[in-house]
């Protein structure tokens, strides 16, 4: 008799068979477009103004109650929109490169699990792999940039704003908020 496992039971079965290293690599693969959103945002934030568009700071140049800028010049609409969309495009490229998604039970041979495995019926499923991948990548990219903006907000409240091209002296606030947001949104999408 064949037992039908729910997608969460299949995921638990798969995860229990992974080593720490292969599990970490699988997570990085699934979240890659989200993690690279900061790089894409920086490129859009620097390159688009060279064409005469922007930069448009998200905070509009306004200050918070403490007298410091809310987010600063480094957080722009150019970067937020461009970084999010580029993450969506990257997820589409990953999905196109991988082909059709397989059942979770068939992924034991590789750490490179298809990002859309088990996506059918999800609230963000459009019926098309391409548009579903774009939505997933865009949301993961946006979540990364939202977390990065939250980190920037906290750094500015603590007086750790960046000076020119030099980052602040708060490496955890430069990386942790965006990683937490990507994982939180990933759990929302990937279960």
Predicted regions and their residues:
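Hydrophobic alpha-helical transmembrane segments
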Residues: 1-191
